[in-house]
Amino acid sequence: MITSIELIDKFDLKFIAGNVAIEIPVANADISRPGLEMAGFFSHYSSDRIQILGTTEMSFFETLSKEERAERMVKLCRKETPCIILTRNIPAPQELIDACNRKGTPLLQSKEATTSLISKITSYLESELAPETTMHGVLVDVYGVGVLITGDSGVGKSETALELVKRGHRLVADDNVEIKEVSRNVLMGKAPKLIEHLLEIRGLGIINVMTLFGAGSVLPEKRLMLNINLETWNKDKVYDRIGLIEEKLSILDSQITKKTIPVRPGRNLAVIIEVAAMNYRLNKMGTNTAKDFNERQNEQIRRQSIKEI
């Protein structure tokens, strides 16, 4: 739960009036600039949002009569309003101080410009209030691609991650990956604090990757882009040999590209994942080798058919 106290510490805000001890939760990442409300229109007032008062709002406020000022500020302060913030160190008018003290709404002050403060608070709230879940797997940064390695227990996820780290890539999380959906199809993954930088290898135990390989071998968080699902080789299953099958892994309300890699003795999984990551980047740049091959093959078949006719 995010409250005004956390915002004070995070954004260097100054407490002016109200009751900061009242823990009114910030449940909405959107920020409101109550311009129409200053003019007296409260029909669609988003009272559950953080209210930001800048130079424009306060300049208009100065044109109001004394009675109108008091009335507008009382209406602005609601029990569900997390806080009201004055930007650019604008002095708080007495009407606003009285209304905040009466209703208990925290009144804060910032030295930052209005647009800059709104941008920073919005980014922070979107990250903190984003839907989240946890998944069993390993998250590794491979050539700048966030690769989530999944599969049954004992299939070799951690061992593969260790080989990738040894080859110069960076570990984000092992065994338990905390995932947040910061926006549509944008998933950020990180490790729980308890197991940050740790890797569990059967027969060896728990190792600290940062201590063994250095600070450059770990990453605090990474966007999930590609899922590599490891599974024991099944001779009765037909695996994709060309690359035309487009699988997707759904996490929360987002999807990422998925590749299923069969595991059997002699396969170098680390190299395969490296190539998968590079191929993913190549596809995003507009080059799809599988589709190009398929088109050339179809063209050759078409030409052969014409010759036979």
UniProtKB/Swiss-Prot annotation:
Q: Which residues form a coiled coil?
A: none
**Assigned protein family:** Belongs to the HPrK/P family.
**Could you name the domain of life of the organism this protein comes from?**
Bacteria
User: What are the start and end residues of every segment in region (Important for the catalytic mechanism of both phosphorylation and dephosphorylation)?
Assistant: 199-208
Q: What else is known?
A: Both phosphorylation and phosphorolysis are carried out by the same active site and suggest a common mechanism for both reactions.
Q: Which SUPFAM superfamilies match?
A: HprK N-terminal domain-like, PEP carboxykinase-like
Originating organism: Macrococcus caseolyticus (strain JCSC5402) (Macrococcoides caseolyticum)
Ordered alphabetically, the record's keywords are: ATP-binding, Carbohydrate metabolism, Kinase, Magnesium, Metal-binding, Multifunctional enzyme, Nucleotide-binding, Serine/threonine-protein kinase, Transferase
The protein here is known as HPr kinase/phosphorylase
- Report residue spans for region: Important for the catalytic mechanism of dephosphorylation: 262-267
Q: Where is the active site?
A: 136, 157, 175 (proton acceptor), 241
Q: Its biological function?
A: Catalyzes the ATP- as well as the pyrophosphate-dependent phosphorylation of a specific serine residue in HPr, a phosphocarrier protein of the phosphoenolpyruvate-dependent sugar phosphotransferase system (PTS). HprK/P also catalyzes the pyrophosphate-producing, inorganic phosphate-dependent dephosphorylation (phosphorolysis) of seryl-phosphorylated HPr (P-Ser-HPr).
Q: Which GO terms describe its molecular function?
A: ATP binding; magnesium ion binding; phosphorelay sensor kinase activity; protein serine/threonine kinase activity; protein serine/threonine/tyrosine kinase activity
